[in-house]
Design a protein with these regions (language model features):
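PLP-dependent aminotransferase-like
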Residues: 67-122
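Conserved PLP-binding active-site segment in aminotransferase class I/II-type PLP enzymes
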Residues: 1-68, 72, 94, 116
Length: 122
């Protein structure tokens, strides 16, 4: 890759973020309080969607999305060969088989051509 490595673990946390976390931790609820539906409503509005569902992790969100799409046994999902394990696991949780597509060495992403090749192998 010609670009510097993406600082995957680096976080950008503001004072407003810290105050929001303190407010939740000092409140009566951690996971079922008013912050969750407020976040879902704000997120839905930000992406112009009628609804949004907060998940505890991207793994859970991928699993939920594939399940909502009806992915199940007999289906094949293609993931890039460079990815976090949850990408493939979410498809397996739904019963689908998983294939992997090579990635472009410059971008680190699968391309239409590598996707086509992976689909032929599937």
């Amino acid at each position: 890759m010609s670009q510097p490595f993406l600082p995957y673990g680096r976080q950008h946390v503001t004072e407003a973020d810290m105050a929001a976390v303190r407010r939740v931790l000092e409140g009566d609820y951690l996971t079922t309080g008013p912050e969750v539906p407020a976040f879902e409503a704000d997120f839905a509005a930000a992406v112009a969607a009628p609804h949004a569902v907060a998940c505890n992790s991207a793994t859970a969100a991928l699993h939920l999305a594939l399940d909502a799409l009806g992915v199940s046994g007999g289906d094949v999902c293609i993931a890039p060969s460079i990815t976090f394990l949850a990408t493939a696991n979410a498809a397996r949780y739904c019963g689908a088989d998983v294939g992997f597509a090579d990635v472009d060495p410059e971008t680190g992403l699968m391309t239409p051509d590598t996707l086509k090749a992976a689909l032929k192998r599937a």
